[in-house]
Amino acid sequence: MKKIMHVAEPFATGVLSFLVDLTRQQVEEYEVYILYGVRPLTPDNVSNLFDKRVHLIKIDSFKGAIGTVFNFKAYRDVRRWYIKIDPDIVHFHSSASGFVGRWALPCKKLSAFYTPHGYSFLMRNGTKFKRFLFWLIEYLSAKRSAVTIACSEGEYKEAMKLSKRSTYVNNGINTKNLKSFVRSISKIQHPIKICTSGTDSLSEKSQTF
């Protein structure tokens, strides 16, 4: 059975839910491993969210985006687990994982993929220097051999500015599983209220991503 190794420094919120859904399908055909870091929003029971066949490997040297990029031990740890697992496919998630993974591993010799999950340099609530630093991280990482898989068309357009080796798969849920719950309704004649929940962050503005 072929192996997939995911590298996810920010193992929380959107990246976490993305991996829960993705690996649920992958374990039917692959051995799946996830190298992850703990963030303040990482659930205590995170292992209970995944299929028992998923191998979760906590990486202590993953300490936030910037802290990980400038931590030599993070590169060594990713490299060490890569050699031990010997995966056929590697998928990096978010900026720090993408930078560390693409520079620590021989991407030209393997099937390597990177998903930004929202480019940090586009955030509106950070300083100019911080946005520039994240842009530089993405710019340098894009020089390595890996295919960027964006989560939306907007993110794909930004990815193409960094690397032509880019594509996108719209992020969302499989509506086929919801068809049995959908009922026909008549045209609404009055205003309706819609409530949504999620991370309160300006970096996730819909018009940007």
Question: Model-derived features: where do they sit?
Answer:
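Short His-centered aromatic/hydrophobic patch
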Residues: 92-98, 116
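Active-site proximal beta-strand in glycosyltransferases
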Residues: 2-5, 106-123, 138, 149, ...
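A conserved mid-protein helix/loop that constitutes part of the nucleotide-sugar donor-binding site
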Residues: 16-21, 196-209
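A short, histidine- and acid-enriched strand-loop-helix "catalytic/donor-clamping" loop
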Residues: 11-13, 62-66, 110-130, 144-147, ...
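N-terminal strand-loop element at the rim of the active site
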Residues: 6-70, 155-160, 168
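Membrane-proximal helix-turn-helix segments that form the acceptor-binding/catalytic region
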Residues: 76-80, 131-147
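Nucleotide-sugar donor-binding and catalytic loop/hinge architecture
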Residues: 1-2, 49-53, 179-193
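Donor nucleotide-sugar binding/catalytic pocket of nucleotide-sugar-dependent glycosyltransferases
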Residues: 55-57, 139-182, 193-197, 202
